[in-house]
Amino acid sequence: MTNLLIINEKPSQFQTFKKALGGEKGTYKGFKYTLCHSYGHLFELKEPAELVSAEKKARYSNWDDLSFYPWDYQDFKWEKRLKMGENAADAAFYQKVFSAIKQKLPGHDAVVIATDTDPSGEGDLLAWEIIEAMGWQGKVFRLNFDDSIPSIQRSFDAMTNVSNKMQNGAYLESTGREQFELLTMQLSRIAKIIAYQSDYKPNTQRIGRLKSVIVDLIYQRTKARDEYVKKPYYELKYKDHSGNIFSRKFTDGVTFRHSNKTAAEQELNAYSTSPIVIDKKEIKKQEPSSLPDLGQVGILVGKHGFKDKEILATYQAMYDKRIVSYPRTETNKIDDDQFAELLPLIDKIAKVVGVDPSLLTHRNLRKKHKTAHAEHGANRPWYNVPESLNQIRKQFGECGVAIYSEVAKAFLAILCEDYVYEKQTAHLQDYPEFKSSINIPKELNYKLVFNEDQLEEKTETDEEPTSFSASASPYIFDGANTKPSKPNKAFILNFLKRKDIGTGATRLQTLADVSQGTDALVKVIKGTYTLTYNGQVQAILCKGTMIASPTITQKLQDGMKAVKNLKMDYRKLPTSVEKIVAHDLPIIKQNAANLRLDKRLAKMKAPKPKFKDKVRGNYLGKEISFNKTWGNHTFTDLEIQDLLANKEITFQAAGKDGNRYPVSGKLAQQTFKGKQYYGFQLNKEKLQQYLEEKKAKDPNRVFCTFEGQNISFKRIWGGHRFTDEEIQKLIQGEKISFSMTSKRGSTYTVTGK
């Protein structure tokens, strides 16, 4: 019987597998098995300078010289290390988790990858990192499932042999993307160098295939709004008693839109009330909208006032409890098994979110919402149905309530009948060029549960139209060219969805990433996304580049799909970066001249520097870099020369008390939060010796032996200077008394010992 070591991605998945298979160890469908789990990625790529040979380290650690770019893919060894985390405790944790998995390996015949089956292939990559680090050379299998118990159990019937990782499309896709993203790091360095050369000081530039598209999109829309000039016009239109509007078809070059009202009023005199002729009436139906991706869930829940980061974290927590389905899915459809899984739960879900069960009469899956097979299926409520929204509120807060309500209603809507409306078209009898078309609701059906109009940028709607009246009268319509809408979440995510860039989860996650932290590229003010100083500089520098182009990003995404389907060598993804950098670097240089011309940037303040200036040089035969400053002291050229020569230097530095002290020290390799670095190391013994000598020479301190111990104390207390006689009494343990003067000028006596 084959003995399997099954690797899960995370503890929650491990617990679900235990339930599905009957325990942490055992037999299942003819296999012996042992379960273990990771905590996501345990490994990471080393820094660029650590991935190349010794003689090339200087080039790949350089942040100042543009001649070192673009990087050469062939120079990289692509080695990984256990993740370091933020501190030594983090590093120890990752080591402990890896060791626990490795200890279970002996005695097994095969390793099984049972991580998330995600669109990016990330689950396969993190599993292979562990497998390779353990030195495993045997068979490797893959289980594909959606984390439900039936799906896990079925996956053993279709286990895939992926022992040759170079034929594992998901692994290759994720590897190619990971290498691509590390190499695009050089664009961030390039942009920062050029910005600093132009005397602009962003504390970061975060250039990447999706981040750059989002930043450019916000920049272009904001710029269009800033440059908008209102151009009023006046146009003759007709309106019937029901409020329906009749107008002529507008095309460039027509003359019926007037720039002044007088001309429109003159035209109005030539027209009169006209009977309406109805051309056509027809009943039409509209199917429920597609199930929302996570980006669209973000739009819906964001309208309740919740931020992207909170939405993502809360949805993930609810998924871990199997209340909602897998967040990072790439489809908006489900298969028959996934639909059948939820059918018995429909009425219970409806009760939780307050939907009338009598509306849920369409119990067959429409073709629009159906796919032959989906690993995870669209975002939807899942098999752990809460008793009430209050139960969710207690566990996940108001954000959880909003998520469940929106996701559940969107799913329940596909169980409703089609929206039915009557489409009417009409024209004016006396002026047939004036036409109108209206849709009159007849049966709302699914729209009573979920209205997809909420996903649009603007959700304001006019009153529902009613049937045409018998006649219509002319009036002058005051119009203007449309001002571009604000760049809100719906605008950004809908644009990316139309361009088919990323999954819904990736789009929402990236939008959250660029708007977080002290080095954010974007900030959100009352639902509107605006660029920070960092983002504005990046947008200006990257205008017209390949990395900020939606078209290029789409091509890269297509390339990743080709790699996944084994139709393209994964190395073509990272090697394409050299071409992108060669194209973009001169454009970024050229765009630097536009920094001073940007009115918004001129009003912004540069953030405080995140990183200190670095010095690079040869130290003990090794190319290193270290901070050019220590405390408030900036090293001189001579001091830098001596430090690199391994000599001790001495300089005056200000202490916390405002006094200056002689400080001595040398360069040394040190460790901070688990990470090694080179920097100035203080000679603490010399400083302590100086302070003691200074204290001994201080005329305002007394040095003596008191109760058998050598001590010192200040000779001045509250403005009173102890006399020699008083000092002798204090040393002998006697009380002394002396006069003091208060702030009000009165005299009082102080006694003490």
Predicted regions and their residues:
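Long, highly charged, low-complexity internal segments
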Residues: 19, 34, 41-90, 103, ...
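Active-site-adjacent bridging/hinge elements
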Residues: 99-102, 184-192, 271-275, 289, ...
